[in-house]
């Protein structure tokens, strides 16, 4: 084995021992390979979209620089490695500058292996060498993610064009026309953060067991961590109870909520479908211009025009009043049932002046007055009267025994059980031992009458 071959083999073996398989890849030919270099960004590094100074994004990782190389037979004694540098977020001008810097490093170290020197420079000094600081400005439109101001110069006064900086053919810019560059950078940053998180150990805030991040869930807003087993059970209970707005961090007084993606990863398909449906419904409930079709077989969400009380269901085409949920009645006041009148009375009496005016406008002032009067009358009748079992007339018992005579149909009935009594012998109902009202003819009579009855007997 020649000295060059031995030096190359030793260098490649050293690189394979330093970097893992995801970072360093050696081709089967033995003299080619590539290495992926993720640069270490300073804390609080930001991305800034050109023309949108308010749209800054905090990131911790950028896609790697890729150094591809081919080692000639006479490397390192005579020839330099043949290489290319590719990047998704650097411009070709910037990559060209890196290529020329690697050429300079080869000139300084000619005759010696240089790959590790190149790698160290690219990994540790690229940002400083190119003058890249936070925020890093990127350009979303066009064929390239960033503008290249150094590539072009304005024409001088004589009309002659200034020299255009030559781009190195070894400088490769990876451009995916199908995906926005900002999306690519943010997705990569998120994936790398998740990878780092998965490899760390965390103490669950619920069961206090120590588990790897791959078995845990991180609430992104507050960064509290819980194991997936605990948080899954917590989510399932909340979804079962219909509390889809309460899938927040279990930490007391913490308002951070789980994302739908996190919920979907933990619960089953049926549970997530219920969660998704209830979440949509609760969101619609908060919208003032959304009501639901009153037909029980439909219940479709309906958009209501401003200053209108008519809703038309887009599914069943039912036209209804958005106030009383009955068929649309135009300018006529809403019609209320007896139970609704009672509720209307309570709402009206407890409302402010503005609330009372709204109810009067909705139902009509006469309807409101009738609701108040009739509901009070109904309450009094329910408290003090019973209905005749034969004709339904309300009967009040002021005094006397429990054998009652209806003032309307003249039928006899029992005040206790409301059973109809015999016209021939109505008192047999109270004298029969098998009757539920046996010996109850005078049950419930007022004490004054009892005492008076007793004193008459004594006389």
Swiss-Prot record:
GO cellular component, one term: nucleus
Disordered: region residues: 141-169
Catalytic activity field: [E2 ubiquitin-conjugating enzyme]-S-ubiquitinyl-L-cysteine + [acceptor protein]-L-lysine = [E2 ubiquitin-conjugating enzyme]-L-cysteine + [acceptor protein]-N(6)-ubiquitinyl-L-lysine
Residue positions binding Zn(2+) 4: 321, 324, 329, 334
Organism domain of life: Eukaryota
Amino acids binding Zn(2+) 5: 388, 391, 406, 409
Subcellular location: Cytoplasm; Nucleus
Membrane spanning residue stretches: none
Claim: Cytoplasm is one of the keywords in the record: yes
CDD domains: BRcat_RBR_RNF14 (cd20341), Rcat_RBR_RNF14 (cd20354), RING-HC_RBR_RNF14 (cd16628), RWD_RNF14 (cd23820)
Keywords: Cytoplasm, Metal-binding, Nucleus, Repeat, Transcription, Transcription regulation, Transferase, Ubl conjugation pathway, Zinc, Zinc-finger
Residues noted as binding Zn(2+) 3 in the record, renumbered to the chain: 293, 298, 313, 316
Functional summary from the UniProt entry: E3 ubiquitin-protein ligase that plays a key role in the RNF14-RNF25 translation quality control pathway, a pathway that takes place when a ribosome has stalled during translation, and which promotes ubiquitination and degradation of translation factors on stalled ribosomes. Recruited to stalled ribosomes by the ribosome collision sensor GCN1 and mediates 'Lys-6'-linked ubiquitination of target proteins, leading to their degradation. Mediates ubiquitination of eef1a1/eEF1A and etf1/eRF1 translation factors on stalled ribosomes, leading to their degradation.
Protein name: E3 ubiquitin-protein ligase RNF14
Organism, scientific name: Danio rerio (Zebrafish)
Gene: rnf14
């Amino acid at each position: 084995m020649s000295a060059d071959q031995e030096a190359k083999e030793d260098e490649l073996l050293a690189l394979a021992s330093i970097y893992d398989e995801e970072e360093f890849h050696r081709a089967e030919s033995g003299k080619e390979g590539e290495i992926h270099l993720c640069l270490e960004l300073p804390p609080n590094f930001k991305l800034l979209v050109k023309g949108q100074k308010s749209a800054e994004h905090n990131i911790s990782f950028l896609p790697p620089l890729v150094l591809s190389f081919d080692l000639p037979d006479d490397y390192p004694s005579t020839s330099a490695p043949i290489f290319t540098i590719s990047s998704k977020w650097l411009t070709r001008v910037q990559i060209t500058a890196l290529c020329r810097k690697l050429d300079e490093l080869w000139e300084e170290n000619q005759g010696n292996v240089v790959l590790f020197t190149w790698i160290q420079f690219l990994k540790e000094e690229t940002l400083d060498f190119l003058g890249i600081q936070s925020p890093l400005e990127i350009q979303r439109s066009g064929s390239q993610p960033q503008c290249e101001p150094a590539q072009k110069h304005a024409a001088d006064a004589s009309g002659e064009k200034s020299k255009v900086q030559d781009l190195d053919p070894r400088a490769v810019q990876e451009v995916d026309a199908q995906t926005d560059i900002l999306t690519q950078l943010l997705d990569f940053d998120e994936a790398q953060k998740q990878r780092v998180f998965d490899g760390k150990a965390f103490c669950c805030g619920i069961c206090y067991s120590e588990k790897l991040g791959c078995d845990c869930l991180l609430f992104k807003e507050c960064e509290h961590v819980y194991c997936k087993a605990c948080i899954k059970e917590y989510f399932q209970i909340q979804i079962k109870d219909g509390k889809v707005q309460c899938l927040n961090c279990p930490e007391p007084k913490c308002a951070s909520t789980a994302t739908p993606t996190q919920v979907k990863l933990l619960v089953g398909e049926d549970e997530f479908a219920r969660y998704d449906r209830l979440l949509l419904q609760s969101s619609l409930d908060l919208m003032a211009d959304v009501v639901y079709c009153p037909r029980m077989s439909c219940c479709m969400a309906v958009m209501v025009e401003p200053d209108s009380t008519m809703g038309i269901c887009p599914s069943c085409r039912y036209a209804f009043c958005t106030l009383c949920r009955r068929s649309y009645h135009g300018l006529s006041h809403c019609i209320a049932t007896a139970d609704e009148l009672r509720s209307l009375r309570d709402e009206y009496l407890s409302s402010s002046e503005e609330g009372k005016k709204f109810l009067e406008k909705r139902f009509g002032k006469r309807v409101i007055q009738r609701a108040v009067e009739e509901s009070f009358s109904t309450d009094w009748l329910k408290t003090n009267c019973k209905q005749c079992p034969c004709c339904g007339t309300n009967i009040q018992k002021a005094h006397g025994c429990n054998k009652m005579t209806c003032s309307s149909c003249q039928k006899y009935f029992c005040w206790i059980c409301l059973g109809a009594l015999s016209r021939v012998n109505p008192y047999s109902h109270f004298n029969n031992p098998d009757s539920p009202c046996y010996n109850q003819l005078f049950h419930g009579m007022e004490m004054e009458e009892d005492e008076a009855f007793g004193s008459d007997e004594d006389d």
